[in-house]
Amino acid sequence: MGNIKQTFIKRTARELFDRYPDKFTRDFEHNKKMVAELTNVTSKTIRNRIAGYITRLVRMKEEGKIL
């Protein structure tokens, strides 16, 4: 069993994904750079968790699991 993501990570990721849907891809490294550009997150750990969740959202959208 994995860990559950914290609420502020999910909220921030969803807001970024809704606001800039064309800027994110399935590539984690690209998403990591975009999160760094679009937010003022200073912590690498938080930035990576947000980018990872956005990568998951992109994959789920492509597979038709979310609208």
UniProtKB/Swiss-Prot annotation:
Q: Which residues cross the membrane?
A: none
State any GO BP term from the record.
translation
Q: Does the keyword Ribonucleoprotein apply?
A: yes
* Gene Ontology annotations for the cellular component aspect, listed alphabetically: cytosol; ribonucleoprotein complex; ribosome
GO MF assignments: structural constituent of ribosome
**SUPFAM superfamilies for this protein:** Rps17e-like
PANTHER family, A to Z: 40S RIBOSOMAL PROTEIN S17
- Self-association state and partner proteins as the record states: Part of the 30S ribosomal subunit.
Q: Tell me which family the UniProt entry assigns to this protein.
A: Belongs to the eukaryotic ribosomal protein eS17 family.
Write down what this protein is called: Small ribosomal subunit protein eS17
Q: Which organism is it from?
A: Thermococcus kodakarensis (strain ATCC BAA-918 / JCM 12380 / KOD1) (Pyrococcus kodakaraensis (strain KOD1))
